[in-house]
């Protein structure tokens, strides 16, 4: 079982997918976890998720860890499948809870609702993150990953 967790191929495409998904999620995770990049930090993020969004504390904690630690796992290629799973689940929940009702498109044009409020973001970006996460869960971290190094030592 442990060998399967670390097993991956010497694939540059997987490395690129892993690295770029990690780069995209690193600032989001650090906003929630440490308050970097203008974020609210752990306490503020927990308060927002549990208070305003009504998410149970354990799931709020897991969401913050999935983005914060998951992005680090993707950047280093350590426990890539676990990191990708956390981020994929986060994105599925985000689509369901926040973005689905806004439609497909991201609204980068600043469209407004009929009530004069900014229209929310759609879910097209999230689908890409979900697809990349699923690919990484299936194939692993690829070339230049710590998983590959560990897998080689487990043989």
Labelled PLM ranges:
Residues 1-35, 57-65, 69-155:
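Extended, low-polarity transmembrane helix blocks
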Residues 34-55, 59:
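Membrane-interface interhelical connector segments
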């Amino acid at each position: 079982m442990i060998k399967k967790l670390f097993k991956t191929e010497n694939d540059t495409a997987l490395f690129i997918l892993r690295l770029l998904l990690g780069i995209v999620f690193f600032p989001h995770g650090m906003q929630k976890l440490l308050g970097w990049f203008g974020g609210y930090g752990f306490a503020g993020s927990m308060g927002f998720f549990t208070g305003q969004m009504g998410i149970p504390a354990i799931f709020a904690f897991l969401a913050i860890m999935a983005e914060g630690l998951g992005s680090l796992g993707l950047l280093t290629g350590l426990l890539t499948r676990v990191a990708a799973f956390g981020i994929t689940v986060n994105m599925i929940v985000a689509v369901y809870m926040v973005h689905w009702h806004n439609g497909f498109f991201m609204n980068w044009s600043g469209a407004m609702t009929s009530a004069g409020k900014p229209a929310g973001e759609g879910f097209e970006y999230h689908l890409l993150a979900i697809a990349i996460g699923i690919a990484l869960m299936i194939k692993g971290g690829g070339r230049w990953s710590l998983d590959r190094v560990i897998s080689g030592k487990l043989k």
